[in-house]
């Protein structure tokens, strides 16, 4: 009987450790983004400031965490873009293989309050093949949506991205209802995480936390 009780305690202990490890919240050190040993920057410059600020220039930009492999879990981040059409595509890339192969959720703040374009406010993409243009042409309104609630397009907003492969849910400003729910189009189930900005776009990021499961 004592041996059985001891075995149960040991099992509970190790399962408890496992669960704690799986649900551990990680807050990457954003003050170290200029350190190439910890972060990899592609096609952007980092502008000094209180938040991570990526400049705008032609082509997509990516700033990814080196020593982290993300599978499933929850990504929380504060994001800010600008209210200028075609110059504000800001979001999070995940399951990154390299700077051209990744999945991403991104926002178009200039569409947030536009009656005609609000349906294009949050977007899922899976590069290199499933670009926003390809998805809009072939699957209209399936991989992009309005956001609820509607943030100020020039202010900070909070994004929560829940990945449970292949399902991805996106929540804005702590809403209980998702603004977007999609199934991933890539077969990759893991990879790096990073800040992403689109063509000619600059973006600001802060308060990044990641809970892996």
Enumerate the predicted regions with their spans:
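Extracellular glycan-recognition regions
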Residues: 22-213
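Bacterial N-terminal signal peptides
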Residues: 7-16
């Amino acid at each position: 009987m004592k041996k059985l009780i001891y075995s149960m305690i040991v099992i509970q202990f190790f399962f408890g450790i496992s669960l704690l490890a799986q649900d551990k919240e990680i807050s990457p050190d954003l003050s170290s983004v200029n350190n190439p040993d910890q972060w990899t920057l592609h096609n952007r410059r980092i502008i000094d400031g209180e938040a991570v600020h990526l400049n705008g220039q032609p082509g997509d930009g990516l700033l990814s965490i080196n020593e982290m492999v993300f599978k499933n879990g929850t990504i929380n981040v504060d994001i800010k873009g600008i209210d200028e059409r075609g110059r504000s595509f800001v979001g999070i890339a995940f399951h990154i293989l390299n700077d051209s192969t990744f999945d991403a959720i991104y926002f178009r703040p200039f569409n947030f309050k536009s009656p005609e374009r609000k349906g294009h406010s949050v977007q899922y993409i899976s590069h290199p093949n499933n670009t926003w243009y390809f998805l809009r042409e072939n699957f209209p309104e399936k991989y992009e949506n309005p956001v609820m609630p509607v943030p100020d397009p020039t202010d900070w907003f909070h994004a929560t991205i829940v990945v449970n492969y292949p399902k991805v849910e996106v929540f804005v400003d702590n809403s209980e209802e998702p603004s977007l729910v999609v199934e991933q189009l890539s077969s990759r189930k893991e990879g790096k995480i990073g800040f992403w900005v689109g063509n000619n776009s600059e973006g600001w990021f802060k308060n990044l936390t990641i809970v892996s499961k």
